[in-house]
Amino acid sequence: NCMTGGNHTFSKLQSVNILKDDARMLRPANHHEDVYGRGFQVYPVTVDGGLFKLAVVNVMGRVYISTLNCPFRTANKIAERLKKETNLIFVDFHGEATAEKIAFGWYMDGKVSAVVGTHTHVQTSDERIMPGGTAFITDVGMTGAFDGVIGGNKDASIARFYYQTPHKTDVATGDVKISAVVVNIDTQTGKAAGIKRIFEPGFK
């Protein structure tokens, strides 16, 4: 049970104490090492009565978003460290560019159990098991209201693009859907055995 972050992690001052005190809350690991919070964490999980350790890693891309440390080098270094403790490693790559996320998936193939992309709010349909045994999807998508523009009020979003001026965007409320993936991981090898994309309820 944890929540990963991204480019809005530090948007609210309340995040300071939450990230410092709650190990369930992660922020991108490729921020500077002096930034408060955790970029990865190992959590106990129970599967069929057995207790296992699942590591969750959070990194953020640099294309169109931020000039952070290299997510490729950061994730690789963390994975090497975590392998000494567990081979069940789940990576959330928060990124804007699909090419960057796909390249990252190839780079981490065989090094981690899963690479799941986030950020764009739009689910992709390219879920797969890569040759090295890593489950991958470019973007898991958004859980929220689809009667809008990536979760925001559609009228305000249209006005912002139409007039090219700022408009306050409230959260959309209608047509709520769940976007998710379920990844099956072999607890012995750490390789993914399956990945299933979820989008419910679907569009009519």
Positions of PLM-derived features:
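Acidic, metal/ion-coordinating pockets
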Residues: 1-204
